[in-house]
């Protein structure tokens, strides 16, 4: 940390705005394509509508003024937040008006969540299944009921209030977006003032946000949940504001409140140990993390972030300067080190977005794993359908975010990279030895692919020939995941040394006992064996191939031996011009396109592994004697070691519910299963067909229209190569994801 004279840093944190920079014009916005001179002239061919969609949010093409681009992004963020709050408000409104939330709250073990009732127009009210408690509707698996229970919501009136609050918030966000673009727009130096931004985000948004949430958990959620856990009827529980206004209600539940704030200021924090706990494990009544543990966590996080938000130098010559930190960061083998990265990240929002998407995507996948290993909400752990769905959801969202990170990194390389700024720094050095990186990564992919797949081929062959003793399995030639087992063991034992007062381990997934809630397994140790070792190496293979494609796209986005002037061709182009064969599918965009298929491939195997493993080895019922009966009876260890086993005992066996769903409340999933297969197959028409074929067909159809004197004013054009691929990959992913959605739902709602 350095202290600098104040005069040098004086300008740093002064907020500077332009007044009324852009007029508010509904006439202009009403004109399609107003942001682009060519598009604004209107459509001549059908390509116009595609370009309109491609460029509407590509602010780089609207203007080259970085300040205006920054303002547009800033305003768009407020618009995005408004859309999110409207969407949340709609979900909460459904919970208030159409759901069985109050019935579920009174008996969460026997009533299943539903927030949608289908109207009987053409007999489709068959979809309203009996979810218990006399309610008929579509079962939902978004986990919202569990979240609301955790918040401390006890009736639909509170949900109505929250839904209205969401709309009010959306209105504020929309106003803020308009105000900060049209009335008081920040100057470029405000957007580039990273120290103030870090202080604000860390301290105000994360720090005070966590502190406020800890306050809600301590004063509202924990007491209400404690009463609910004790079996107090919902109508007898005080309303949220009563806990805050009437201290005696809180003191009855948590005596630590009687001491007031004195222990806080005298550092005698042990007085608060009844509502800021460190129990570990899960609440045996609900199967969720202890809310008092979560309160403690959020309070600690708030303290850390508020301290972190004081670290960076603004107008008081004290604290860190990001530019100085980066420029001093040099190792013995990294040349100029991080010099130039500050300029990259403050002048290229694509570079900034790329790193943020990669981090956020990775974090989302980590969250997917925490949701089952340490279920944060009450009664989430025993709602198997919801567990499966939120795992799948977070895995896929994480995958899309990571691919998006690679996409924007490639756009940065093409549009924003400045070779003068990046001379012999880490980025320049990585680009200069990209051949070594990519060829080694390629070798790793080949090695992993042949060896991991080879183990399965061996097992299928041995099983086909009736030689089980020669297979890789827990009962023949063992390939135990010894490192993973060591890590599990370490995590089970470690809290004994690091947190001696904790009552239970961090997660039962690593070790400990079986936690049953209402006769169902909430969590238990997940034993790993040969089957997990095999599928883990398939995960390693598919993830490395995805990384190979995406990283190659970024490192070769500007140039390659094949096309040295690639940067001049832009981020997306079909081929290097006519007359140069073998140069198609080399643009940055094409690498993202290919990367999406491998991301989907990769993550499908992840969710299949999770779904089968949990049904086989974790989820199930527990009898009075403590014996566990798993949903698929522990068949993972012996069936998942052959490809035939995956096809027969997972895909085929578990598809029976969706295939046989007609005539039942699950029949919509049967229709969806077929429809999504159709959407997937439809994508192949775009992916396996050339542009010329369609252009010829279109011209013959246009001839027929001319003959009938119904010629279109806008000339029809075949999709460009890139547009065709975009439509293809979109339908491929949509079809694949919706097929999986129907397959998972129909099965787990039946058996879970």
Curated annotation (Swiss-Prot):
Gene Ontology CC annotations of this record: photosystem I; plasma membrane-derived thylakoid membrane
Source organism of the structure: Trichormus variabilis (strain ATCC 29413 / PCC 7937)
Annotated keywords: 4Fe-4S, Chlorophyll, Chromophore, Electron transport, Iron, Iron-sulfur, Magnesium, Membrane, Metal-binding, Oxidoreductase, Photosynthesis, Photosystem I, Thylakoid, Transmembrane, Transmembrane helix, Transport
Catalytic activity: reduced [plastocyanin] + hnu + oxidized [2Fe-2S]-[ferredoxin] = oxidized [plastocyanin] + reduced [2Fe-2S]-[ferredoxin]
SUPFAM superfamilies, A to Z: Photosystem I subunits PsaA/PsaB (SSF81558)
Binding of phylloquinone, residues: 694
GO biological process, one term: photosynthesis
Single GO molecular function: oxidoreductase activity
Protein's job: PsaA and PsaB bind P700, the primary electron donor of photosystem I (PSI), as well as the electron acceptors A0, A1 and FX. PSI is a plastocyanin/cytochrome c6-ferredoxin oxidoreductase, converting photonic excitation into a charge separation, which transfers an electron from the donor P700 chlorophyll pair to the spectroscopically characterized acceptors A0, A1, FX, FA and FB in turn. Oxidized P700 is reduced on the lumenal side of the thylakoid membrane by plastocyanin or cytochrome c6.
Binding site for chlorophyll a: 685, 693
Cofactor binding, note field: PSI electron transfer chain: 5 chlorophyll a, 1 chlorophyll a', 2 phylloquinones and 3 4Fe-4S clusters. PSI core antenna: 90 chlorophyll a, 22 carotenoids, 3 phospholipids and 1 galactolipid. P700 is a chlorophyll a/chlorophyll a' dimer, A0 is one or more chlorophyll a, A1 is one or both phylloquinones and FX is a shared 4Fe-4S iron-sulfur center.
Enzyme nomenclature, EC number: 1.97.1.12
Binding-site residues for [4Fe-4S] cluster, renumbered to this chain: 575, 584
Domain of life per record: Bacteria
Post-translational modification: The N-terminus is blocked.
Subunit structure as annotated in this protein's UniProt entry: The PsaA/B heterodimer binds the P700 chlorophyll special pair and subsequent electron acceptors. PSI consists of a core antenna complex that captures photons, and an electron transfer chain that converts photonic excitation into a charge separation. The cyanobacterial PSI reaction center is composed of one copy each of PsaA,B,C,D,E,F,I,J,K,L,M and X, and forms trimeric complexes.
Gene name in the database record: psaA
Protein residues bound to chlorophyll a': 677
Disulfide bond entries: none
Protein name as catalogued: Photosystem I P700 chlorophyll a apoprotein A1
């Amino acid at each position: 940390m350095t202290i600098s004279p104040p005069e040098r840093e004086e300008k740093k944190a002064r907020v500077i705005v332009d007044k009324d920079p852009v007029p508010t014009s509904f006439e202009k916005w009403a004109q399609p394509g107003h942001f682009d001179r060519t598009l604004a002239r209107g459509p001549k061919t059908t390509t116009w509508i595609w370009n309109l969609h491609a460029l509407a949010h590509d602010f780089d093409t609207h203007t080259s003024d970085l300040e205006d681009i920054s303002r547009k992004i800033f305003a768009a963020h407020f618009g995005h937040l408004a859309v999110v709050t409207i969407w949340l408000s709609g979900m909460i409104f459904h919970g208030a008006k159409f759901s069985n939330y109050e019935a579920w709250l009174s008996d969460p073990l026997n009533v299943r969540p539903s927030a949608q009732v289908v109207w009987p127009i053409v007999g489709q009210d068959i979809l309203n299944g009996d979810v218990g408690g006399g309610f008929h509707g579509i079962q939902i698996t978004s986990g919202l009921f569990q979240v609301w229970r955790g918040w401390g919501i006890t009736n639909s009136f509170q949900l109505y209030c929250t839904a209205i609050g969401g709309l009010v918030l959306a209105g504020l966000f929309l106003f803020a977006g308009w105000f900060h673009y049209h009335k008081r727009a920040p100057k470029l130096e405000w957007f580039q003032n990273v120290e103030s931004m870090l202080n604000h985000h860390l301290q105000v948004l994360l720090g005070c946000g966590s502190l406020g949430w800890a306050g809600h958990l301590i004063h509202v959620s924990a007491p209400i949940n404690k009463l609910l856990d004790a079996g107090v009827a919902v109508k007898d529980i005080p309303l949220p504001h009563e806990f805050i206004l009437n201290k005696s209600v809180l003191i009855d539940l948590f005596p630590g409140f009687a001491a007031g704030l004195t222990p806080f200021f005298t550092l005698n924090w042990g007085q608060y140990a009844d509502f800021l706990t460190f129990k570990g494990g899960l609440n045996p009544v609900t199967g969720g993390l202890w809310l008092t543990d979560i309160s403690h966590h959020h309070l600690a996080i708030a303290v850390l972030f508020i301290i972190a938000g004081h670290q960076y130098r603004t107008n008081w010559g004290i604290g860190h300067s990001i530019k100085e930190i980066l420029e001093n960061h040099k190792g013995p083998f990294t040349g100029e080190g991080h010099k130039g990265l500050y300029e990259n990240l403050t002048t290229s929002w694509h570079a900034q977005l790329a790193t943020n998407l990669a981090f956020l995507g990775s974090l989302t996948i980590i969250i997917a794993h925490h949701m089952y290993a340490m279920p944060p909400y009450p009664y989430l752990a025993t709602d198997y359908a919801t567990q499966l769905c939120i795992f799948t959801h977070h895995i896929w969202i994480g995958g899309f975010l990571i691919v998006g990170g690679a996409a924007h990194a490639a756009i940065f390389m093409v549009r924003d990279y400045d070779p003068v700024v990046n001379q012999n720094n880490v980025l320049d050095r990585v680009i200069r030895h990209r051949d070594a990186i990519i060829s080694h990564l390629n070798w790793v992919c080949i090695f992993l692919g042949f060896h991991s797949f080879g183990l399965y081929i061996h097992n299928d062959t041995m099983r086909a020939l009736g030689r089980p003793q020669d297979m890789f399995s827990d009962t023949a030639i063992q390939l135990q995941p010894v490192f993973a087992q060591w890590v599990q063991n370490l995590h089970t034992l470690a809290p004994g040394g690091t947190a001696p007062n904790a009552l239970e381990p961090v997660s039962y997934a690593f070790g400990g006992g079986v936690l049953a809630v209402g006769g169902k397994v909430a969590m238990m140790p997940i034993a790993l064996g040969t089957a997990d070792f095999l599928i883990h190496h398939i995960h390693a293979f598919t993830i490395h191939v995805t990384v190979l494609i995406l990283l190659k796209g970024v490192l070769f986005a500007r140039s390659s031996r094949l096309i040295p002037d690639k940067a001049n061709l832009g981020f997306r182009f079909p081929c290097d011009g006519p007359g140069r064969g073998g140069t198609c599918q080399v643009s940055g965009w094409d690498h993202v396109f290919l990367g999406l298929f491998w991301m989907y491939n990769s993550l499908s195997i992840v969710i299949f592994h999770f779904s089968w493993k949990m049904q086989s080895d974790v989820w199930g019922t527990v009898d009075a004697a403590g014996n566990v009966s798993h949903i698929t009876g522990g068949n993972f260890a012996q069936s998942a070691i052959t490809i035939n086993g995956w096809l027969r005992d997972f895909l085929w066996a578990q598809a029976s519910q969706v295939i046989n769903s007609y005539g039942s409340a699950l029949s919509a999933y049967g229709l969806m299963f077929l429809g999504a297969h159709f959407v997937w197959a439809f994508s192949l028409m775009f992916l396996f067909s050339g542009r010329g074929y369609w252009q010829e067909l279109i011209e013959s159809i246009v001839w027929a229209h001319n003959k009938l004197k119904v010629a279109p004013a806008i000339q029809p054009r075949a999709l460009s190569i890139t547009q065709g691929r975009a439509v293809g990959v979109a339908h491929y992913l949509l079809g694949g994801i919706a097929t999986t959605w129907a397959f998972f739902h129909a099965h787990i709602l039946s058996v879970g």
